[in-house]
Swiss-Prot record:
HAMAP family: RapZ_like. This is Nucleotide-binding protein SPO0713. The keyword ATP-binding applies. It comes from Ruegeria pomeroyi (strain ATCC 700808 / DSM 15171 / DSS-3) (Silicibacter pomeroyi). One of its GO terms (molecular function) is ATP binding. Belongs to the RapZ-like family.
Amino acid sequence: MTGPSGAGRSTAINVLEDLGFEAIDNLPMGLLMRLLDGPALRRPLALGLDARNRDFSTEGFLDLSKRLASLEGFQVTTLYLDCSADILLRRFSETRRRHPMSPGSSPLEGVEHELELLRPIREAADTLIDTTALNVHQLRREVERWFAPSGGSMLAISVESFSYKRGLPRGLDMVFDCRFLANPHWQPDLRAADGRDPAVAAYVHADPQYLPFFTRVTDLLQSLLPAFRSEGKAHLSVGFGCTGGQHRSVALTEAVAKALAEAGGQVSIRHREMERRKPDARPD
């Protein structure tokens, strides 16, 4: 990926990283082949190449693109982020930054010089995204349209259980209180188990208030996910809390995470208190 300074390359590389790419920005061209000679890639690779780097040249970029395309086992796409000169000037003016190619000359001369330098790459690129009329959110959606798996934005969802006695975990976007549900702690045969145990989960699910609560929560989350994706949100963190963080919140976390995963979500689970729990600790 390349493009003129101010066209949005840093934003685009961050979007690709959110989509699961291994993203490296400002990589000197001379290091690229050495990078590929290293350990096998486990994820798609996104590389941002900057015309300001001292080893950058148009000819070198085009030659490198051809060499990469000829490698067996690699599918290579060249992405060029374009933008009109007047908008690039406006963006640099708004940020009060000097154009990197205009030391001792006018900003317009720097912008025009860089656009002319990159013109052959623009003409040879596989994919061109014109950011002239795009804001950050629109650019994110455009990059996702081209490069997201199955054509959709990836939104990572983490679902976490916790104990209110130990405070709310940091970084939660949404919190649900489970303390109104029947507490397995008061059942001697369930006290030592946790919410992943089928007997504990069945006890929690048998509470008449459980199903309406579970249904409303999952309906709410599933109705909001498209809006979060549309806004370019990369991660959603949802927490379920109960008194001790061992029974009710764990059972809800497991059930909600399963429902979201079955609906196509990229879901991870964390049970905070169980990570902290000592062998002699008492669940709620």
